Amino acid sequence: MAVRKLKPTSPGRRFQTVSDFEEITRSTPEKSLVIGLTKKSGRNNNGRVTSRRRGGGHKRLYRIIDFRRDKAGIPAKVAHIEYDPNRTARIALLHYADGEKRYILAPVGIRQGDMILSGEGADIKPGNALPMSRIPVGTNLHNIELQPGRGGQFCRAAGTYAQLVAKEGKYALLRLPSGEVRKVLAACCATVGQVGNVNHENISLGKAGRARWLGNRPKVRGVAMNPIDHPLGGGEGRSSGGRHPVSPWGMPTKGYKTRDRKKASSKLIIKRRGQK
């Protein structure tokens, strides 16, 4: 994938960059693997905002992705590489030897016509999924499970990967994209390789409207609000807020650590992100 820079025919296009989509081989999704997607606009079942700055955006169909990779021992052929509006990564449509079709995240280096395999006997090549107990130390991984059979939860965004740095008993040690090193059960499955669409981080939206197409709404600063709306609001003229940065509910933010010290998974974290 390469990034294409647009001609500056308007202020909105001057700094706008787009993907060239050269890896895409089909524009319409597999009908049996899509479902309708209802917009939530950041609201929960009570209708209250639980995730601010969401709403609008283009209508989407949800592509059902196989994060479990539990079809062990059955080879599959990569039929197509497709665009997915619901994520930054590309997706690959697999045609299994028994006739089933599934979508997976498309890793770097995968091409139309390649053969993919899941299970303990799979080779160490991009796109194959197997338990980390069977993967050599130093391998780059994505779509990593936290519990066996739960499905991949780590490293699913475009260009991300974790590195298998060691094995200790029933645990595998992973270095995550954040720099955190943590233990994960070696029985958990992971997919070999790095998630594709690596140049996604170099995309510049160029204008506010393009963010709205994605369903992102404006972010209003607390100091620009009224006192009723935010602890930093109010004051005569422009002000700094008069206190350390906080959320609208008074929780310290911008660097303040809010992780629960008694969280059970803390004992599995060898090195926190940001630590030297």
Swiss-Prot record:
Q: Which Pfam families match?
A: Ribosomal_L2, Ribosomal_L2_C
**Where does this protein have compositionally biased stretches of type Basic residues?**
259-276
GO BP, one example?
Answer: cytoplasmic translation
GO cellular component: a single term: large ribosomal subunit
Q: What InterPro entries does the record point to?
A: NA-bd_OB-fold, Rib_uL2_dom2, Ribosomal_uL2, Ribosomal_uL2_bac/org-type, Ribosomal_uL2_C, Ribosomal_uL2_CS, Ribosomal_uL2_dom3, Ribosomal_uL2_RNA-bd_dom
SUPFAM superfamilies linked:
Nucleic acid-binding proteins (SSF50249), Translation proteins SH3-like domain (SSF50104)
Keyword Transmembrane attached = no
Q: Where is this region: Disordered?
A: 222-276
Q: Which GO terms describe its molecular function?
A: rRNA binding; structural constituent of ribosome; transferase activity
User: Keywords in UniProt for this one?
Assistant: Ribonucleoprotein, Ribosomal protein, RNA-binding, rRNA-binding
Q: Does the keyword rRNA-binding apply?
A: yes
PANTHER family, A to Z = LARGE RIBOSOMAL SUBUNIT PROTEIN UL2M, RIBOSOMAL PROTEIN L2
**Known function:** One of the primary rRNA binding proteins. Required for association of the 30S and 50S subunits to form the 70S ribosome, for tRNA binding and peptide bond formation. It has been suggested to have peptidyltransferase activity; this is somewhat controversial. Makes several contacts with the 16S rRNA in the 70S ribosome.
How is the quaternary structure described? Part of the 50S ribosomal subunit. Forms a bridge to the 30S subunit in the 70S ribosome.
Per the record, the similarity remark reads:
Belongs to the universal ribosomal protein uL2 family.
What protein name is recorded for this chain?
Large ribosomal subunit protein uL2
Q: Which organism is it from?
A: Nitratidesulfovibrio vulgaris (strain ATCC 29579 / DSM 644 / CCUG 34227 / NCIMB 8303 / VKM B-1760 / Hildenborough) (Desulfovibrio vulgaris)
